[in-house]
Regions:
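Structured beta-strand/loop patches that form or line metal/cofactor-binding pockets in enzymes
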Residues: 56-85
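Glycine-rich phosphate/diphosphate-binding loop of Rossmann-like nucleotide-binding domains
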Residues: 211, 216-323
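Short, Lys/Arg-enriched N-terminal segments with co-localized hydrophobic residues
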Residues: 1-14
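Flexible, glycine/charged-enriched surface loops at secondary-structure junctions
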Residues: 34-37, 55-60, 133, 170-179, ...
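Adenosine-phosphate binding glycine-rich loop
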Residues: 16-39, 235-236, 347-459
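Glycine/serine-rich phosphate-binding loop and adjoining beta1-alpha1 elements at the start
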Residues: 110, 129-244
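Rossmann-like adenosine-cofactor binding region
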Residues: 279-377, 382
Length: 459
């Protein structure tokens, strides 16, 4: 498989032979894992300026070790549907790196899930978690189970079957899963219940994203979407601007998208789009957030239902929301959703800022186009780190048997996102590429993990 090496992530840096060799080794070991190879290549490309200045980071096969998971777990998940028929899905947990703390990363339930996607997400999670300055390593898990159109009973039975295998691999100081696509508060509850039954322990910190009534953290539900918007606002602050009066386009209509819309509206922006796999809605007057929440969170219906109740909005079937005039784009759906053609359309429609709410939603071609057009671009490992940062805050509350107010948790989230932004920007400036947030995020995250690995020896 051939993956073109793009120049979007660097300013005049040629990928060093050392890094090219590492990538070739990764590609030879994982020849069919395109998502994982894409994520690995993006990080390795960004490290050329670092290794040119500090070549010791290539010693003792550090790069080879950081690109190979510490542990990959794959297992069958048999469960019984409402018709009494046994179904079998595949479960995954990739425990990628624990140099900074216990493995931390979400569980994704979606029919497209495979080992490549889980490894790409876990690899990104290493550096995302490092950027938060919290004591957490990187991991990811999930299953090809599709919760769409499943009954509550079927989802409960699947979660119980999934945890029956997963429980032996996780723990408050070992590996702490959370939610992701297809895994919300309901699923976390079922997973925790089965863990508690099997172990006969109430280890609140073994999962995050719990209901606030039994160990969850206020502001955790909002954190990923809020964080992406806070990061975008910090990017605008570098130009003495903010989101007040700006037009914002959002993709997705799940948890991340909904709370990105909410935070953007609170900061004075007009959000005009949202989407799902069937198409997107354009509401030129501004999204009615309460209506959207009713449709997606209560009724679990398609976004097309929105226009039936708000006639001034328009639904575009099987299209994406990137051909709409906008100042700020927040891709919050899934990986590689925003292509080169989408990026061209956004640039032609006045785009200034991209802040990724999803994980790797922009293709390399899209990022290259943004770079050439001087559009400021924030990669998900930095801009959507608010979710895992607040998960770490939930772990802190569980460990101390405390429960913080929403205001306290949100204030900590705001501080963390500003620090991540400033650290990325300062690192990019240190390597003579101002506002290259991709380079800044990758180098900053990598050095924190690499330094810990060096200190702890070859293990």
């Amino acid at each position: 498989m051939f993956i073109k090496i793009f120049s979007a992530f660097r300013k005049g840096w040629k990928m060093l032979p050392t890094l090219e060799l590492v990538y070739e080794k990764v590609k030879n070991r994982n020849p069919y894992e395109k998502e994982y190879l894409q994520a690995t290549l993006e990080v390795l490309e960004s490290l050329s300026p670092l290794l040119k200045k500090y070549p010791e980071y290539a010693d003792d096969s550090l790069l080879e070790r950081i690109t190979e998971p510490e542990r990959q777990i794959m297992f069958r998940v048999p469960w019984v549907d409402d018709n009494g028929k046994v179904q079998v899905n595949r479960g995954y947990r990739v425990e990628f790196n624990s140099a900074l703390g216990p493995y931390k990363g979400g569980l994704r339930f979606h029919p497209t899930v495979n080992l490549s996607i889980i490894k790409f997400l876990g690899f990104e999670q290493i550096f995302k978690n490092a950027l938060t300055n919290q004591a957490i390593g990187g991991g990811k898990g999930g299953s090809d189970f599709d919760p769409h159109k499943k009954s509550n009973g079927e989802i409960m039975r699947f979660c119980q079957a999934f945890m029956t295998e997963l429980y032996r691999h996780i723990g408050e100081n070992t590996d702490v899963p959370a939610g992701d696509i297809g895994v919300g508060g309901r699923e976390i509850g079922y997973l925790f219940g089965q863990y508690r039954k099997i172990t006969n322990r109430f280890d609140a910190g073994v999962l995050t994203g719990k209901n606030i009534h039994w160990g969850g953290s206020l502001a955790r539900t909002e954190a990923t979407g809020y964080g992406a918007v806070l990061f975008a606002n910090s990017m605008l602050h570098t130009e003495n601007k903010d989101l007040e009066g700006k037009t914002v386009t959002v993709s997705g209509s799940g948890n991340v998208a909904i709370y990105a819309i909410e935070k953007a509206q609170k900061l004075g922006a007009k959000v005009v789009t949202f989407s799902d796999s069937s198409g997107f809605v354009h509401d030129e007057k501004g999204v009615d957030l309460q209506l959207l929440k009713q449709i997606k969170e209560v009724e679990r219906a398609r976004v097309s239902e929105y226009v039936a109740r708000r006639p001034e909005a328009v639904f575009y079937s099987n299209q994406k929301p990137w051909n709409v005039p906008t100042d700020v784009a927040l891709p919050c759906a899934t990986q590689n959703e925003l292509t080169g053609d989408d990026a061209k359309a956004l640039v032609n429609n006045g785009l200034q800022i991209v802040s990724e709410g999803a994980n790797m939603p922009s293709t390399p071609e899209a990022i290259e186009i943004f770079k050439k057009a001087n559009v400021k671009f924030a990669p998900g490992k930095a801009s959507n780190a608010g979710g895992v940062a607040t998960s770490a805050l939930e772990m802190q509350q569980n460990a101390s048997r405390e429960k913080w107010s929403f205001e306290k948790a949100e204030a900590k989230l705001t501080d963390i996102m500003k620090t991540i932004h400033d650290d990325c920007m300062q690192t990019a400036e240190e390597f003579d590429d101002p506002f290259n947030y991709v380079l800044g995020a990758n180098i900053q995250g990598f050095t924190r993990v690499a330094n810990a690995m060096i200190d702890q020896g070859i293990i």
